């Protein structure tokens, strides 16, 4: 078991649950939210080491959520989105994400990116 806490913010319940199960099976503690507002609430209540955030969600989108969380937090953020245009990726990275994964994705790719970001983060 590792000690990392990962927040997954995704409005598609099937994707949310799938990522949650996969990360739990890899030893991560997983917190889940269906929109950015709920994600920010979890961040204020729990120690989070990395967030995987969908961009297009109801209530509060991922871009707004990451802009708000960057006001007080510096843990790694991976955007997860069906938006695959280069401009979308550049925007996501410029507002504070550390990585950008496009849907569809494989669980192995997402896990590799999570591990990579946490490895970098743990050095600081």
Predicted feature locations:
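N-terminal/domain-start alpha-helical segments
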Residues: 1-122
């Amino acid at each position: 078991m590792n000690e990392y806490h990962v927040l997954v913010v995704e409005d598609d319940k099937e994707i949310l649950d799938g990522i949650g199960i996969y990360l739990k099976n890899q030893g991560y503690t997983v917190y889940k939210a269906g929109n950015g507002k709920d994600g920010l609430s979890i961040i204020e209540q729990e120690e989070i080491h990395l967030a995987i955030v969908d961009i297009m969600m109801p209530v509060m989108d991922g871009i707004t959520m990451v802009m708000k969380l960057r006001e007080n937090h510096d843990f790694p953020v991976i955007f997860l989105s069906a938006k695959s245009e280069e401009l979308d990726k550049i925007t996501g990275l410029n507002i504070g994400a550390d990585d950008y994964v496009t849907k569809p994705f494989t669980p192995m790719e997402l896990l590799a990116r999570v591990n990579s970001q946490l490895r970098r983060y743990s050095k600081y």
